[in-house]
Amino acid sequence: MNALAATNRNFKLAARLLGLDSKLEKSLLIPFREIKVECTIPKDDGTLASFVGFRVQHDNARGPMKGGIRYHPEVDPDEVNALAQLMTWKTAVAKIPYGGAKGGIGCDPSKLSISELERLTRVFTQKIHDLIGIHTDVPAPDMGTGPQTMAWILDEYSKFHGYSPAVVTGKPIDLGGSLGRDAATGRGVMFGTEALLNEHGKTISGQRFVIQGFGNVGSWAAKLISEKGGKIVAVSDITGAIKNKDGIDIPALLKHTKEHRGVKGFDGADPIDPNSILVEDCDILVPAALGGVINRENANEIKAKFIIEAANHPTDPDADEILSKKGVVILPDIYANSGGVTVSYFEWVQNIQGFMWEEEKVNDELKTYMTRSFKDLKEMCKTHSCDLRMGAFTLGVNRVAQATILRGWGA
């Protein structure tokens, strides 16, 4: 089942639990706007190259639409649509005043020079500048993009609309980026894990973790979890996978990955088959890489008691069912990885106010939001006698549905 089908399925289950009117259900599912543009740029060798860019603006009932822009060879309209919809529910679960959006360009950023990436970003911005904006749609980084990409978008957008730092988040600090934004998703994963374990009478200290993915989210989650006494016993990234049953020295691994661009070759752990990472023995599994990695083929072999979905849509519905029967507790993506968009909201607020916060305030506010959201999610679980994923979906869908009705759009 692809990401869009799985997301639609979860939405429909939540709508049924909430007893939503069929017309309202249909209107909440259909995106507000889908944008597809061609971006032709001159390459460094003088030839022309053409790329297709997408932006799906899913819902704006609760505020400006919000979501990342990814650069990847396999950017797929269905996946972008699914991720835009997930952002709508995620921002509602986090109780921040946004709707959902997502964008992307079908390209391989590793095969483009910095100047080619800049030209591509500027052309894409020129094509969509009148459809995004501070109070309309606020992009952010995603796979294959980062603070520099956001700086180019900000600059190009500002040529048309005047200097507008709040039009994108995840910017460099020198252009109005927020302190704490780089660590935000990983820190949110840690706060969410704490909240879940507390519910089960446990703490992070002494728990054995396996983390799939050691990019921004996975590496920050590993660092913060290890600082809380968690034992990271296995890690993987695009270069390979490593294991140390006594616990990996995370500061040493972070130093190694910075120098060698990956976990491969780290001498403080043994190399293992990357395909086995999800089924390694542990207490808590943190998928922090791609979607759809936990499926019916491997779900029965998973040994973890808890799964923290740091990635978007890492568990497909078939695996969900298998794991539920095994008693595995899954902290769903639309809550678990919402730290990033929450601190993006803080960045947007700081830009609009023209007043920047200290990092301690950013982190304290993030903890407050993550703790409150978990309590709200658990209340929905009790109300509807459902698991955490349906608790999160009913919480998010209900908030968007109520805003839609209040604005007079649900008739």
Swiss-Prot record:
EC number(s) reported in the record: 1.4.1.3
Top-tier EC class: oxidoreductase
Instruction: Tell me which family the UniProt entry assigns to this protein.
Output: Belongs to the Glu/Leu/Phe/Val dehydrogenases family.
> Any idea what this protein is called?
Glutamate dehydrogenase 1
Keyword NAD set for record: yes
Q: What PROSITE patterns does the record point to?
A: GLFV_DEHYDROGENASE (PS00074)
Keywords (alphabetical) are: NAD, Oxidoreductase
- SUPFAM superfamilies linked: Aminoacid dehydrogenase-like, N-terminal domain, NAD(P)-binding Rossmann-fold domains
What does the entry give for GO biological process? amino acid metabolic process; response to absence of light
Q: So which domain of life are we looking at?
A: Eukaryota
Q: Which InterPro entries does the entry link to?
A: Aminoacid_DH-like_N_sf, Glu/Leu/Phe/Val/Trp_DH, Glu/Leu/Phe/Val/Trp_DH_C, Glu/Leu/Phe/Val/Trp_DH_dimer, Glu/Leu/Phe/Val_DH_AS, Glu_DH, NAD(P)-bd_dom_sf, NAD_bind_Glu_DH
Q: Which GO terms describe its molecular function?
A: ATP binding; cobalt ion binding; copper ion binding; glutamate dehydrogenase (NAD+) activity; glutamate dehydrogenase (NADP+) activity; glutamate dehydrogenase [NAD(P)+] activity; zinc ion binding
- Identify the gene encoding this protein: GDH1
List the catalytic activities from the record: L-glutamate + NAD(+) + H2O = 2-oxoglutarate + NH4(+) + NADH + H(+); L-glutamate + NADP(+) + H2O = 2-oxoglutarate + NH4(+) + NADPH + H(+)
Matching entries from Pfam families are given as: ELFV_dehydrog, ELFV_dehydrog_N
Give the GO cellular component terms, alphabetically.
Answer: mitochondrion; plastid
Q: Where is the active site?
A: 102
**Which organism encodes this protein?**
Arabidopsis thaliana (Mouse-ear cress)
